[in-house]
Amino acid sequence: MLSLAQLESWFFIAPALLLAVLSGYLAERVGIINIAINGGMVFGGLFMALLSYGFTNNLNQSAPSWSLFITIPLSVLFSSVIGCLFALAAVKLRADHVIVGTGINLLASGITLFISQNAASLFSDTTLRVRYLFPIQTTVSIEAIGVFVFSLLLIGFVWYLMSFTKTGLRYRAVGENPNVIDTQGISVYKYQWIGAICSMMVAGLSGSLFVLSVSNFPFNSGDVNGLGFIAIAIMIISMWRIIPSIFIGLIFAYAYVFTNSQIGSNSNSYLLRTIPFIISLLVMLLFGFLNVAPKNIGKHFDKGLR
């Protein structure tokens, strides 16, 4: 069982992981391979950390919880810029999707490390950190529950949109057979741009929630503990379906929080960190034969093949 502090962390980690899976879903359903989820999360966490400094007057203060209604939306908005870069390279310039995703991951880590190493001169702080600190309570905080419920509602809305609307049908068809969509006079490129941008915005939201789970602790590693790569594994295991990904994601989030809680009291801390990734690999090996990825994933749209 999880302690109260671990449960509080789970209420932030679980939505972050589920939204990271949704980020991959949104891109790959329009045929764009998205291994940039981790980088998108790092950018979201970076924006969240930088914005949190705007609500503190000195190093002994934490940002007020009401400012989350400002910093989280702004983090998502700034992440749309990363989405535009992703779409520009993958759709407009027709670059290899895997290389583009790798580039975004490296860029995110590099920028975060650079800012963290210069935190003393930029923020008069010892290191880059998220300036939110939720007081210890006898129950899970309202902020954590609110984030969890909002994330589930957002995922439910996307599921309904993709499953029961004309827009969702067209969206998914772009990743299966874009030429059929093109013959109907519908812009394939428009849907791919929307998919890439929304994917990075959701990844940014995921990253901002992740750093809240480690609030007021250093965010100087240039990474989100590889949570974006676990999200890719969950997306594959759930066969690019939203509902199965929710249940699988909640289980993985529990395993992630539990193993991390044991790191401080165990000499084999580095080995414990690998457990979520080992589980991901084993499950992928066991259920890899069920791979039902979108048929046009990773392929650039060509009008000449109509």
UniProtKB/Swiss-Prot annotation:
Lineage: Bacteria, Bacillati, Mycoplasmatota, Mycoplasmoidales, Mycoplasmoidaceae
GO molecular function, one term: transmembrane transporter activity
Alphabetic keyword roster: Cell membrane, Membrane, Transmembrane, Transmembrane helix
Subcellular location: Cell membrane
Annotated protein name in UniProt: Uncharacterized protein MG121
Family matches, as InterPro entries: ABC_transp_permease (IPR001851)
Membrane topology: Multi-pass membrane protein
Positions of disulphide bridges: none
UniProt keyword Amino-acid biosynthesis present: no
Membrane-crossing residue ranges in chain numbering: 7-27, 30-50, 68-88, 95-115, 144-164, 194-214, 232-252, 274-294
Annotated source species: Mycoplasma genitalium (strain ATCC 33530 / DSM 19775 / NCTC 10195 / G37)
Keyword Thylakoid included in the entry's annotation: no
Coiled-coil ranges (or none): none
